[in-house]
């Protein structure tokens, strides 16, 4: 979703005052993986038109299309293969690992790549090929598991575990996470490299616009229940309607990503990097390159600007309040709102699948609201200050997460059993849930912009080090994701499954984050504030 996804947004590219291209995935920023000092050693490319710059960033839309499907469909789907609700969160551990390991390494290598095709395009091509492979493995995991020895019963009859398919699926899921991280950083850096007279701010806006477009198309695809009707050959003995819909959506993702990739490779003309060139400083004196990677980021804790530790604390609390919903939003719709069960009776399975599709539609609404809200962040911060905007968004998330629990209880008020056994739901409740999804687009826009803008401004007042500060900020995002991935499933299991306990905990974290923000966040100049988008991603 132009969501954070979870880990793995874009790394590099950036520069130019407070304009900073940032991602969740490790060590990004104005330097990491994107144009940093090594960019100075590249011959200046010929200026390109705005239209060509726009087409050069199209690959971001293709990558985000697949990421939107991953966010909306994959947590619910893996439960149909046998993985328990309590264990599904562990599957998402790969995100922060990929962000911390892949992003810095790819950023470093792409900065110094001497290929005749340029520094960024070889990594973009490699990453996209791996993404296509990963989504095919995920989409056909049930069929692969069937061939490897899973039950030979028809999927319309057998609803038990299929462990070969589940293992294949998880491997594909992890490959997809690593592949996304391989593409995002160089793709952002490519836009910064080519921005020229248009400026990094324009390049960042184009990149984020493509990601928003990918989100909208991806969530629309995920909410569609007709792929198995349009392409009936997708259904097999191991793959029924829900699986065939997933398969169809991912096959379209391969086609769309391939189209976006080809256009980017054609229109993004890079000047090859000369590996023996010096790395100049502002004073035109040679300097040793700054450290790159997780260790350099960890060492940076010793040299943080004033106010940055407080930003890290509030950022961590803010993301702790968001990750449960990011991981389980469509699962919540399938279980608590539509009263389905991925391992239950046929009516329960159908109800669960309907809820997941409704959740994907809710994420579509969320992305649309997020896109419009993003344009309002900078004016609001200039008027009342980024601290007020950030704190207010945390309190809104607190209310929204508490509302999910209240809506869940409302949905079950006439049923005296467990979440998984209720089969009916009120249409008004479903409508309220969609409104809630859309409403959350507003604080999500704040989450994707304000913390990074505050970090950029603190670094600027210190006289530099934006890439380092952003890399350190990334740690305050990755650690909460690890905490939620390890703890959300067992926490829900402790209270009797369902998603209500995790959402209740998220509400508490949002409240603490809001209160902490009031007392800890540094005062930032309203007049000098410049909005910075992390551009979604993982």
From Swiss-Prot:
The terms under GO molecular function for this entry are: maltose:proton symporter activity; salicin transmembrane transporter activity; sucrose:proton symporter activity
| pH curve summary | Optimum pH is 5.
Q: Where in the cell is it found?
A: Cell membrane
Q: Its topology with respect to the membrane?
A: Multi-pass membrane protein
GO biological process annotation, one example: sucrose transport
Q: What happens when the gene is disrupted?
A: Male sterility probably due to impaired pollen germination.
Pfam families from the xrefs?
A: MFS_2
**Tissue/organ expression:** Widely expressed. Highly expressed in embryo, endosperm, germinating seeds, source leaf sheaths and panicles, but at very low levels in roots. Expressed in phloem companion cells.
Family matches, as InterPro entries: MFS_trans_sf, Suc_symporter_pln
Name assigned to this protein: Sucrose transport protein SUT1
Q: Which organism is it from?
A: Oryza sativa subsp. japonica (Rice)
* Record lineage: Eukaryota, Viridiplantae, Streptophyta, Embryophyta, Tracheophyta
Q: Which gene encodes it?
A: SUT1
């Amino acid at each position: 979703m132009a969501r954070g996804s979870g880990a793995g947004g874009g790394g590099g590219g950036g520069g130019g005052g407070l304009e900073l291209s940032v991602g969740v995935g490790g060590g990004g920023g104005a330097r990491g993986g994107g144009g940093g000092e090594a960019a100075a050693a590249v011959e200046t490319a010929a200026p390109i038109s705005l239209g060509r710059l726009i087409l050069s960033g199209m690959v971001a839309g293709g990558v985000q299309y697949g990421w939107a499907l991953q966010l909306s469909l994959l947590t619910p789907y893996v439960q149909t293969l046998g993985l328990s609700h309590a264990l599904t969160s562990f599957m998402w551990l790969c995100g922060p690992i990929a962000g911390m390991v892949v992003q810095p390494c790819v950023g470093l290598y792409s900065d110094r790549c001497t290929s005749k095709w340029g520094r960024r395009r070889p990594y973009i091509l490699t990453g996209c090929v791996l993404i296509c492979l990963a989504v095919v493995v995920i989409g056909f995991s049930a069929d692969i598991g069937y061939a490897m020895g899973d039950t030979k019963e028809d999927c319309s009859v057998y609803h038990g575990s299929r462990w070969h398919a589940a293992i294949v699926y998880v491997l594909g899921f992890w490959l997809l996470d690593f592949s996304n991280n391989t593409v995002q950083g160089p793709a952002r850096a490519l836009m910064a490299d080519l921005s020229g007279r248009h400026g990094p701010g324009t390049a960042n806006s184009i990149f984020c616009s493509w990601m928003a477009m990918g989100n909208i198309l991806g969530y629309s695809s995920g909410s569609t229940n007709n792929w198995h009707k349009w392409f009936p050959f997708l259904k097999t003995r191991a793959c029924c309607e829900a699986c065939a819909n997933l398969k169809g959506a991912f096959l379209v993702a391969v086609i769309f990503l391939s189209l976006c990739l080809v256009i980017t490779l054609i229109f993004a003309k890079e000047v090859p990097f000369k590996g023996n060139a010096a790395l100049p400083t502002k004073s035109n004196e040679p300097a040793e390159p700054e450290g790159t990677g997780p260790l350099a980021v960890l060492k940076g804790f010793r040299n943080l600007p004033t106010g940055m530790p407080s930003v890290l604390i509030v950022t961590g609390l803010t993301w702790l309040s968001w990750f449960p919903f990011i991981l389980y939003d469509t699962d919540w719709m399938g279980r608590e709102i539509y009263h389905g069960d991925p391992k239950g009776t046929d009516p329960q399975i159908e109800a669960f699948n309907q809820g997941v599709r409704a959740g994907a539609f809710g994420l579509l609404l969320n992305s649309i609201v997020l896109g419009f809200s993003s344009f309002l962040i900078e004016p609001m911060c200039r008027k009342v200050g980024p601290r007020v905007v950030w704190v207010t968004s945390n309190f809104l998330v607190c209310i929204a997460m508490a509302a999910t629990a209240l809506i869940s209880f409302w949905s079950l008020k006439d049923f005296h059993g467990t979440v998984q056994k209720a089969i009916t739901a009120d249409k008004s409740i479903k409508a309220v849930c969609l409104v809630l999804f859309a409403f959350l687009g507003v604080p999500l826009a704040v989450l994707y912009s304000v913390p990074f803008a505050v970090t950029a401004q603190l670094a600027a007042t210190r006289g530099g080090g934006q890439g380092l500060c952003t890399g350190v900020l990334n740690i305050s995002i990755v650690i909460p994701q690890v905490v939620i991935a390890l703890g959300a499933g067992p926490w829900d299991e402790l209270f009797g499954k369902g998603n209500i306990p995790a959402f209740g905990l998220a509400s508490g974290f949002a409240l603490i984050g809001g209160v902490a923000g009031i007392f800890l966040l540094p005062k930032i100049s309203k007049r000098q504030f410049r909005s910075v988008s992390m551009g979604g991603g993982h």
